């Protein structure tokens, strides 16, 4: 059982220290990764030995096969696995006995030696010396039932990363995508900036916020639901091409495509409009997909998504009229509500903005390939500039992929009088019970009164984008440490005990 296993490992540690061996030394000079070793020496033929080439490697022991005075074992680092071979006449009898007694699956060790290929053709390190680097006190999941419970994976992601090369590659792809985004924008003259996480008032999106309390001023504050209004303040202050990658927080439900804590990027460009931001969105995502997946046609959950540009652009009014037979500009609320009732949609709040939002949700599911839905009504776009050809609409787009909103962008509203009136309308909606409506932000209106140039703004939900490039069915699969319902530590330990096998 787990308790006995840990006691045995603790006894081994005590024994090592009594021998003058520190089981947790400070460093090891690792020269090559597993991938670099494979790339450098894969040309060797089966049975070929390259004793003149010395190398050092370190990683976690994933398996061991003892054969008398020799042992084969696999080690893993963050680039993959490599086999190693140790024998008594190479490291000495004392060190071989120490290896057999004290090097276990899950431990970290460093090895020095030379490469060769086994008779079966597997690239292997011939160990001439080794150093124990870290003793593991717990068995790896491969020693019990594996990881079948997704909740355990989400609570203890490190376990999945230890035993699953696929998980390592999934998150490597996520982290690489972030690098690609930064390289793409930096090469175009954008500057990465930072704005506050703690807000005095919420803004930039329609969502229920997390509330916290700042003791030093004895005031309530909010975790940001979006960085938009602070980024626009930077544009007002004189920056022209900026972006921010960071966490946002919305105190709402959890689903396969929603997380209360999520990562987004927001991008703002002075003297640009929503057409420019559409082009930028398309070019940016194409670059990310191409460099992380190697192709623009990817498989997602058994279906093909084609990211090849140019992407389709559809006006929201035309799209809903074609699919549902309603006119979101001309039809009264009663007609829109009746259409929703036909589809069995129930609404707690029945203002026009919510009616249009729910109608949109009904039809976006069928959009698989990237599609821009453009020109939203003013009532659902309080921060977007009115359309230059129809003041009932705004210059706004949403990017839909596989039925999910991935990006949202505007020609930004820079008329302070119009913005103030929109805030008043949002405040009225809050008074009527809409907790997701925007709060009045008088300081932002004041900032606009100093003048903001014509500006294009864009926000992309990165977690959802990363779901596509990693073929992950749920958003929690691409968030390293997602929010899950907590369990007591003792309960989690009992679950482990239940699956443990000696």
From Swiss-Prot:
It is found in: Cytoplasm. Disulfide bonds: none annotated. Mg(2+) 2 binds at residue 405. This is Lysine--tRNA ligase. One of its GO terms (molecular function) is lysine-tRNA ligase activity. The keyword ATP-binding applies. The gene is lysS. Belongs to the class-II aminoacyl-tRNA synthetase family. SUPFAM superfamilies: Class II aaRS and biotin synthetases, Nucleic acid-binding proteins. GO terms for cellular component: cytosol. Its EC number is 6.1.1.6. The keyword Acetylation does not apply. InterPro entries: Aa-tRNA-synt_II, aa-tRNA-synth_II, aa-tRNA-synth_II/BPL/LPL, Lys-tRNA-ligase_II, Lys-tRNA-ligase_II_bac/euk, Lys-tRNA-ligase_II_N, Lys-tRNA-synth_II_C, NA-bd_OB-fold. It holds the Pfam family tRNA_anti-codon. Its cofactor is Mg(2+). GO terms for biological process: lysyl-tRNA aminoacylation. Keywords: Aminoacyl-tRNA synthetase, ATP-binding, Cytoplasm, Ligase, Magnesium, Metal-binding, Nucleotide-binding, Protein biosynthesis. It catalyses: tRNA(Lys) + L-lysine + ATP = L-lysyl-tRNA(Lys) + AMP + diphosphate. PANTHER family: LYSINE--TRNA LIGASE, CHLOROPLASTIC_MITOCHONDRIAL, LYSYL-TRNA SYNTHETASE. Homodimer. Binds 3 Mg(2+) ions per subunit. It comes from the Bacteria. Mg(2+) 1 binds at residues 398, 405.
């Amino acid at each position: 059982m787990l308790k006995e296993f840990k006691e045995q490992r603790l006894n081994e540690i005590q024994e090592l220290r009594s021998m003058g061996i520190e089981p947790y030394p400070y460093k090891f000079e690792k020269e090559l990764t597993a991938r670099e070793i494979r790339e450098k020496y894969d040309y060797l033929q089966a049975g070929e030995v390259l004793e003149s080439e010395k190398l050092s490697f370190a990683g976690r022991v994933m398996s061991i096969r003892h054969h008398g005075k020799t042992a084969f074992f696999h080690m893993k680092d963050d680039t993959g696995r490599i086999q190693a071979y140790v024998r008594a006449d190479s490291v000495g009898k004392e060190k071989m006995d120490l290896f057999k007694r004290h090097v276990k699956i899950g431990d970290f060790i460093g090895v020095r030696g030379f490469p060769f290929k086994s008779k079966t053709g597997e690239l292997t390190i011939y160990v001439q010396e080794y150093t124990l680097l870290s003793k593991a006190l717990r068995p790896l999941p491969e020693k019990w039932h594996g990881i079948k419970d997704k909740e355990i994976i989400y609570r203890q992601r490190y376990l999945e990363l230890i035993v699953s090369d696929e998980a390592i590659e999934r998150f490597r792809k996520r982290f690489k995508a972030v690098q690609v985004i930064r390289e793409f924008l930096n090469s175009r003259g954008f500057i990465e900036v930072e704005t506050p996480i703690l807000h005095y008032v919420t803004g930039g999106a329609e969502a229920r916020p997390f509330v916290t309390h700042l003791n030093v001023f004895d005031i309530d504050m909010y975790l940001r639901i979006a960085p938009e209004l602070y980024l626009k303040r930077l544009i007002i202050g004189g920056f022209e091409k900026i972006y921010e990658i960071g966490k946002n927080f919305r105190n709402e439900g959890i689903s396969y495509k929603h997380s209360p804590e999520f990562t987004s990027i927001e991008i703002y460009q002075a003297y640009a409009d929503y057409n420019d931001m559409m082009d930028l969105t398309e070019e940016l995502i194409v670059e990310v997909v191409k460099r992380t997946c190697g192709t623009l046609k990817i498989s997602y959950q058994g279906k093909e998504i084609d990211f090849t540009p140019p992407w389709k652009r559809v006006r929201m009014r035309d799209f809903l009229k074609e699919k549902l037979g309603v006119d979101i500009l001309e039809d009264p609320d009663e007609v829109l509500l009746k259409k929703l009732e036909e589809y069995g949609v129930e609404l707690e709040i029945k203002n026009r903005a919510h009616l249009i939002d729910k109608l949109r949700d009904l039809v976006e599911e069928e959009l698989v390939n990237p599609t821009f839905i453009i020109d939203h009504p003013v009532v659902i776009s309080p921060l977007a500039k009115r359309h230059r050809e129809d003041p009932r609409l705004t210059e706004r787009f949403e990017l839909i992929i596989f039925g999910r909103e991935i990006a949202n962008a505007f020609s930004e509203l820079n008329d302070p009088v119009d913005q103030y009136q929109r805030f008043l309308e949002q405040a009225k909606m809050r008074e009527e019970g809409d907790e997701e409506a925007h709060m009045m932000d008088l300081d932002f209106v004041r900032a606009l009164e100093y003048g903001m140039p014509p500006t294009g703004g864009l926000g992309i939900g990165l977690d959802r984008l990363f779901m596509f490039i990693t073929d992950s069915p749920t958003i929690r699969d691409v968030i390293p440490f997602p929010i899950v319902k907590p369990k007591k530590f003792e309960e989690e330990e009992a679950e482990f005990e239940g699956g443990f096998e000696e």
